[in-house]
C-alpha cells in the first residue's frame, strides 16, 4: 500500500510536471487528501485516468490549461480533471473514455464526463475501509 500524501502524490506530481514540460499546456495539480493508503491497483488506476484525461484534453480539446484535483468527500475519493479546451456537445465513447470507465469501475467507482464548458472528468472512488494512517 502507498500513502497518497507522499509516494502516490509524488508520482502524480511528477506526471504533471512531465506533461507541463512536453505539452505546452499548463497542468495544475491539487491533492487535498492526506493519510490514505492506496493499494497498487488503486494507485495505478488513478495514474492512468489522470494520464488519459490529460491526453484527451490536449488531443481532442486543444486545452491550454488543465486542472487536476483529488479530494476526499465522506467515504469516497473524488478525482476531477477539468480543462479549458473546446469541449464537446456530444461525448463519444472512444477508447480513452471507455478505459477510464473500466478502470474506475474495477475500483467499484463511477465516472462521468461533461463537455459543456471545456471538458470535465469526475470520478468517485470508494475508500477501502480502515486504510488510513493515524
Feature names for model-found ranges:
Residues 76-80, 122:
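Short, highly conserved beta-strand within the GHKL-type HATPase_c fold
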Residues 65-75:
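Short beta-strand/loop element within the Bergerat-fold HATPase_c
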Residues 10-44, 50, 54, 58, ...:
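Helix-loop-beta hinge of the Bergerat
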Residues 123-129:
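C-terminal beta-strand of the catalytic ATP-binding
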Residues 89-117, 122:
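ATP phosphate-binding glycine-rich loop and adjacent ATP-lid/helix-beta elements
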Residues 83:
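Acidic ATP/Mg2+-coordinating residue in the GHKL
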Amino acid at each position: 500500500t502507498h500513502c497518497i500524501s507522499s509516494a502516490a502524490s509524488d508520482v502524480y506530481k511528477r506526471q504533471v510536471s512531465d506533461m507541463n514540460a512536453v505539452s505546452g499546456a499548463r497542468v495544475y495539480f491539487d491533492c487535498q487528501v492526506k493519510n490514505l493508503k492506496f493499494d497498487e491497483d488503486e494507485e495505478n488506476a488513478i495514474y492512468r485516468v489522470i494520464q488519459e484525461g490529460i491526453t484527451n484534453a490536449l488531443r481532442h480539446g486543444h486545452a491550454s490549461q488543465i486542472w487536476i484535483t483529488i479530494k476526499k468527500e465522506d467515504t469516497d475519493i473524488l478525482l476531477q480533471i477539468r480543462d479549458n479546451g473546446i469541449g464537446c456537445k456530444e461525448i463519444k465513447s472512444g477508447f480513452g473514455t471507455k478505459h477510464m470507465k473500466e478502470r474506475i469501475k474495477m475500483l467499484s467507482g463511477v465516472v462521468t464526463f461533461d463537455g459543456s464548458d471545456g471538458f470535465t472528468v469526475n470520478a468517485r472512488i470508494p475508500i477501502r475501509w480502515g486504510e488510513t494512517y493515524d
